[in-house]
Regions:
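Bacterial N-terminal signal peptides that target proteins for export
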Residues: 1-8
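Bacterial N-terminal signal peptides
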Residues: 8-17
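Sec-dependent signal peptide cleavage junction
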Residues: 19-26
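Glycan-processing catalytic domains of CAZymes
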Residues: 28-409
Length: 409
């Protein structure tokens, strides 16, 4: 998930079986939705050539956006299990788009990327997949998880990545919820769910206009409204929204982020959001005069290839195990193609040490399972549980600074 490029086109290639689909946009639009399974709405942008940094684009009709059941007025119980901003907490990014139960998809993985130990039972559709991964996250000492969210079928963003005939971004959520419910019934420790808002879906929206702000918001609404509030990750009573970068945003300012919380409070019992923004959100974009943008937290993506970022303005200790996308990416660093060796775990361990020493209260592991960029720390055939164990060792050390996290209900 590199700035402006990412491996979205690769993910689509890996995910899609070769079958006849209902719609096809012109070929050569990398990173866009250019295949639409039967029964899904065709994105308004399917036949446009979208480019990062392109001109501002109105998101158009939001008729495709449908909230889940956990939203007012029909749902009224918004009691949360909340952490405190004084706690030391750890999280990771969960790329739940995989379905390796299909032999063709698995074949495109094998020999190129790390593979989970039981790929025949590794799918976004399977509750047991999420339950196993969530339990391993708990074993790593993590407090909450950040599933990457790419919106609903039909949204105008550049990436919809349908895993035909299923749509992973929405259809994976019920399986995650069932996994949490199973653990709850079994008396397992809770793992809360926050939202990793993949802003590459924003399709050059202007987030200072009424239409742009509402598009920005409905993705948050439709993610959280699909998950029972007791499972939401919250800090100081505010559900977490973790923003990726601004490459696919044409304009924004402080009002863009304020709108998220204002609208969320209207729909979810007065709750406001705990917004952690990527470093590109520090100042407005496309707005004259420029202005500062603030929120609850700040991180910088890129620890996996570049190492620990010591910039003093950051509130999140971002760590990563290394990075490798040169199996398919050519052109060197200037094209965001990197091969950063894991050094047998030493690259990751050094960053974990720096994270503990930094004094920052939030640690984010980049990533749990973005296999196609070689940033995975989950259990795999290639690395076993090495990175889970390393994470646990240093998360325990981090939390030892203040004791266990405080959870209020």
């Amino acid at each position: 998930m590199r700035r402006g490029l990412g491996t979205v086109a690769l993910v689509i290639t890996l995910a899609l079986p070769v079958i006849a689909l209902a719609q096809e946009a012109p070929t050569g639009y990398p990173g866009q939705s250019n295949t639409v399974p039967v029964g899904f709405p065709t994105p308004e942008t399917a036949f446009e050539r979208l480019m990062p940094g392109g001109p501002a684009r109105d998101p158009g009709s939001l008729a495709w956006a449908h909230p889940g059941p956990y939203i007012a007025p029909n749902w009224t119980d918004f009691v949360l299990r909340s952490f405190s901003s004084g706690d030391y907490l750890a999280t990771t990014y969960y790329f739940y788009w995989h379905d390796l139960t299909d032999p063709d998809r698995l074949g495109r993985f094998t020999g190129r990327f790390d593979v989970p130990p039981d790929p025949a039972h590794y799918s976004f559709l399977l509750p047991e997949t999420h339950q196993r991964e969530f339990n391993d996250m708990l074993a790593a000492g993590l407090d909450f998880v950040l599933p990457v969210y790419w919106g609903e079928p039909g949204h105008p963003g550049r990436t919809t990545a349908e895993t035909s005939p299923h749509y992973w971004s929405t259809e994976g959520i019920p399986a995650m919820v069932e996994a949490l419910q199973r653990n709850e019934q079994q008396g397992a420790p809770p793992l809360q769910i926050g939202m990793f808002y993949d802003t590459t879906i924003l399709a050059n929206a202007d987030l200072t206009t009424a239409a742009g702000k509402e598009y920005f918001y409905v993705n948050v609404r439709d993610f959280y409204s699909r998950i029972p509030p007791r499972f939401w990750a919250a800090i100081d009573g505010k559900p977490i929204v973790w923003l990726y970068d601004t490459v696919w945003v044409s304009r924004f300012d402080q009002s863009s982020l304020d709108y998220l919380s204002d609208r969320f409070a209207n729909d979810f019992g007065g709750l406001r959001l705990y917004i952690v923004r990527e470093s590109q959100w520090q100042g407005s974009k496309g707005v004259d005069p420029p202005s500062t943008v603030t929120s609850d937290g700040l991180y910088a993506w890129g620890a996996a290839p570049f190492g620990f970022n010591t910039s003093p303005e950051l509130t999140v200790a971002e760590v990563g195990p290394g990075f490798k996308n040169t199996q398919y990416c050519t052109g060197g660093p200037e094209r965001n193609c990197f091969d950063v060796d894991r050094q047998g775990g030493a690259w990751y361990e050094q960053q974990l040490k720096e994270a503990v020493a930094s004094g920052r209260h939030l640690l984010a592991a980049e990533t749990w399972n973005e296999f196609s960029e070689g940033t995975d720390i989950q259990e795999t055939v290639q690395t076993g549980r090495q990175y889970i164990d390393l994470t646990r060792r240093y998360v325990d050390e981090l939390k030892g600074l203040s004791g266990a996290a405080t959870v209020t209900e």
